[in-house]
Regions:
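A short helix-turn-beta junction within AAA+ P-loop NTPase domains corresponding to the substrate/partner-engaging
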Residues: 218-237
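N-terminal nucleic-acid engagement/recognition segments and initiation subdomains in replication
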Residues: 1-93
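AAA+/SF3 P-loop NTPase mechanochemical coupling elements
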Residues: 154-159, 192-210
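Short glycine-/polar-rich loops that comprise or flank the Walker A/P-loop
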Residues: 159-162, 186, 203-206, 222-228
């Protein structure tokens, strides 16, 4: 990549399986592992890009390697009782809007969408299950953030994701809420990593926030239209194998 070597590795996951990662490598180690002539066969790119697409995904665009990850799922016609049950529980009377939301994430990943805020003081409501479902659906294009991640100046690990989800949000400071609102409608954003120059990229991330605080998880002004708030009821039954 430019003048830097990367190695693709398969990192074991806690629940089984592996996740592909790209780690920095060097010429000397490459020669030791594969011989001096191997470097000539290594693919070369001018740089990275981030172009989200699920239907016609391209791993390489021109001479740039696409950092957006492909997802292995292919839509199929048929019944989907488990997913439908979860979406009905989360979105209730707005079920059709919830299905539209998921469809837009898949078909139009650069489309701006409202900040989805799921709140409930009760336990066992399925909020975390819904976040894990989104992660299972869109895989490495979903990242779990903490409240502190939004306040950090370093954002390179989440700025190029489709979905940024927070399992227990508490951004009750005015500056936190303003930053979140601005990000939800921003077309570009400056990425910053430790030891590297800032770089401006297209920003297409959507936010899904969960909270047990029904009254002030974030500051929402009267008339604000950038939030979609859903109060989630307790689950009537608990399917612990849903994501399997």
């Amino acid at each position: 990549m430019g003048t830097t070597l990367y190695k693709i590795v398969e990192q074991p996951k806690l629940n089984g399986g592996y996740v592909r990662k790209r780690i920095a490598w060097n010429n000397e180690t490459l020669r030791q592992d594969y011989g001096k002539d191997y470097i000539g066969s290594v693919p070369k790119y001018d740089g990275f890009c981030t172009v989200p697409e699920h239907v016609s995904y391209q791993p390489v665009i021109g001479k740039f390697l696409n950092l957006y990850e492909p997802i292995p799922h292919q839509p199929q016609e048929g019944d989907f009782p488990s997913v439908r049950s979860l979406v009905e529980h989360i979105f209730g009377e707005q079920y059709e809007l919830g299905m539209d939301y998921l469809q837009l994430l898949y078909l139009q990943p650069i489309q701006k969408l409202p900040i989805l805020l799921l709140v409930s003081e009760e336990r066992n409501t399925g909020k975390s299950t819904f976040l894990n479902f989104l992660k299972a659906l869109f895989q490495n294009n979903v990242t779990f953030n903490t409240n502190e991640d939004f306040r950090s100046q370093f954002n390179s690990d989440w700025a190029g994701k489709l979905l940024i989800v927070v399992d227990e949000v508490l951004l009750s400071r005015r500056e936190d809420s303003e930053r979140l609102k601005n990000l939800s409608t921003a077309l570009s954003y400056k990425v910053e990593a430790k030891g590297k120059d800032r770089d401006e990229i297209a920003f297409f991330a959507k936010f899904v926030l969960c909270s047990n605080n029904e009254y002030l998880p974030v500051i929402i002004d009267a008339g604000e239209t950038r939030y979609w708030v859903r109060k989630i009821d307790r689950l009537q039954s608990d399917d612990t194998d849903f994501l399997q």
